[in-house]
């Protein structure tokens, strides 16, 4: 910066609040500007939004091929603790939610068991 600008800056720094307000008024009238419009036009602050990571998952049985129904039925009984009749009704009426509120690792483990048995499974 030039010495002229540096000296002006130092002079402005030394002003009291009343003197600075008077300077602003004088600049507004001299240059025909409105300092309040400049003060309110502050740059927009960008807020960084973090995508929430899911902590709870629901295990949904979406499809069971007819030839894999018995294997899937065994796994469903193991996972849910249902009796044979209830598990069969559940498998026959897909899509159905098997479990909710599962952790990510538990949900993935159960999904793997069901897909290995032949079912199509979704995590929601």
From Swiss-Prot:
One annotated GO biological process: translation
Cystine residue pairs: none
InterPro entries membership: Ribosomal_bL12 (IPR000206), Ribosomal_bL12_C (IPR013823), Ribosomal_bL12_C/ClpS-like (IPR014719), Ribosomal_bL12_oligo (IPR008932), Ribosomal_bL12_oligo_N_sf (IPR036235)
Protein keywords: Chloroplast, Plastid, Ribonucleoprotein, Ribosomal protein
Compartments, as annotated in UniProt: Plastid, Chloroplast
Superkingdom assignment: Eukaryota
GO cellular component terms, A-Z: chloroplast; cytosolic large ribosomal subunit
SUPFAM superfamilies found in the cross-reference section: ClpS-like (SSF54736), Ribosomal protein L7/12, oligomerisation (N-terminal) domain (SSF48300)
Transmembrane segments: none
A Pfam family this chain is assigned to: Ribosomal_L12_N
A molecular-function term among this protein's GO annotations: mRNA binding
Keyword Ligase belongs to the record: no
Family under the similarity heading: Belongs to the bacterial ribosomal protein bL12 family.
Protein role: Forms part of the ribosomal stalk which helps the ribosome interact with GTP-bound translation factors. Is thus essential for accurate translation.
Assembly information from the UniProt record: Homodimer. Part of the ribosomal stalk of the 50S ribosomal subunit. Forms a multimeric L10(L12)X complex, where L10 forms an elongated spine to which 2 to 4 L12 dimers bind in a sequential fashion. Binds GTP-bound translation factors.
HAMAP family on file: Ribosomal_bL12
Descriptive protein name: Large ribosomal subunit protein bL12c
Species this chain originates from: Cyanidioschyzon merolae (strain NIES-3377 / 10D)
Lineage, highest ranks first: Eukaryota, Rhodophyta, Bangiophyceae, Cyanidiales, Cyanidiaceae
Gene name tied to this protein: rpl12
């Amino acid at each position: 910066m030039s010495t002229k600008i540096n000296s002006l800056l130092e002079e402005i720094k030394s002003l009291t609040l009343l003197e600075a307000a008077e300077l602003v008024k004088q600049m507004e009238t001299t240059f025909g500007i409105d300092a309040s419009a400049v003060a309110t036009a502050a740059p927009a602050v960008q807020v960084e939004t973090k995508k929430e990571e899911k902590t709870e998952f629901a295990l949904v049985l979406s499809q069971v091929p007819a030839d894999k129904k018995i294997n899937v039925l065994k796994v469903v009984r193991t996972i849910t603790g249902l009796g044979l009749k209830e598990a069969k009704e559940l498998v026959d009426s897909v899509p159905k939610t098997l479990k909710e509120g599962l952790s990510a690792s538990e949900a993935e483990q159960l999904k793997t068991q069901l897909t290995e048995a032949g079912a199509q499974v979704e995590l929601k």
